[in-house]
Amino acid sequence: MFPVKVKVEKSELEMAKARNQLDAVLQCLLEKSHMDRERLDEEAGKTPSDTHNKDCSIAATGKRPSARFPHQRRKKRREMDDGLAEGGPQRSNTYVIKLFDRSVDLAQFSENTPLYPICRAWMRNSPSVRERECSPSSPLPPLPEDEEGSEVTNSKSRDVYKLPPPTPPGPPGDACRSRIPSPLQPEMQGTPDDEPSEPEPSPSTLIYRNMQRWKRIRQRWKEASHRNQLRYSESMKILREMYERQ
């Protein structure tokens, strides 16, 4: 009995590895967020007496004392305490994570928030700045269009709001699929009845014939794909000009 080899798909291993790496990154971000929150709580829990002791210790070391009068220092401490009291509930409602050297506050988004505003806030890299909420009932402003309805041109730049449609794949009324080529007809090699039939071909001969046929089929698919891409040449030209202007 021959031994049976179990082949493990490489894609499953890569998927499991990527999933483990993602879990590790999320766990690290969660732990770091807890540490940052504890540090903020410790800073918010400091009393004015701690600040006064710090001022006394600085004066004892011989450094220049603060030029403020006692009533000014008391006023400043009172303002700091009021700011901490007002900012306490706001800080407790923040959930800042850092991913690839950029931070975003996820507490400002709900479960139904689309991914685009979250990515936009992450790219801004300013967790303290909250994303402006757009009312779902407010209609979007209409896009300015010219006579053709494809683009708007001003004196400085060319703003494109709509790409031109692709050219038709074939003549009007012809329902053909431009991406799928026509099937290649099999080669029938028949022999007259009076001639003796050829012996059965060997496996290597069959493989060679099939390889030659599949090469022609693959070439037909490449040509069909190239013809289909040419239908979008105008759109590609506009996108290329937009990319080169950046």
Swiss-Prot record:
One of its GO terms (molecular function) is protein-containing complex binding. The keyword Phosphoprotein applies. There is a cross-link at K5, K7 (Glycyl lysine isopeptide (Lys-Gly) (interchain with G-Cter in SUMO2)). The keyword Iron-sulfur does not apply. Residues 163-172 have a biased composition (Pro residues). The modification N-acetylmethionine is found at M1. GO terms for cellular component: Myb complex; nucleoplasm; transcription repressor complex. Component of the DREAM complex (also named LINC complex) at least composed of E2F4, E2F5, LIN9, LIN37, LIN52, LIN54, MYBL1, MYBL2, RBL1, RBL2, RBBP4, TFDP1 and TFDP2. The complex exists in quiescent cells where it represses cell cycle-dependent genes. It dissociates in S phase when LIN9, LIN37, LIN52 and LIN54 form a subcomplex that binds to MYBL2. PANTHER family: LIN37 HOMOLOG, PROTEIN LIN-37 HOMOLOG. This is Protein lin-37 homolog. The lineage of its organism: Eukaryota, Metazoa, Chordata, Craniata, Vertebrata.
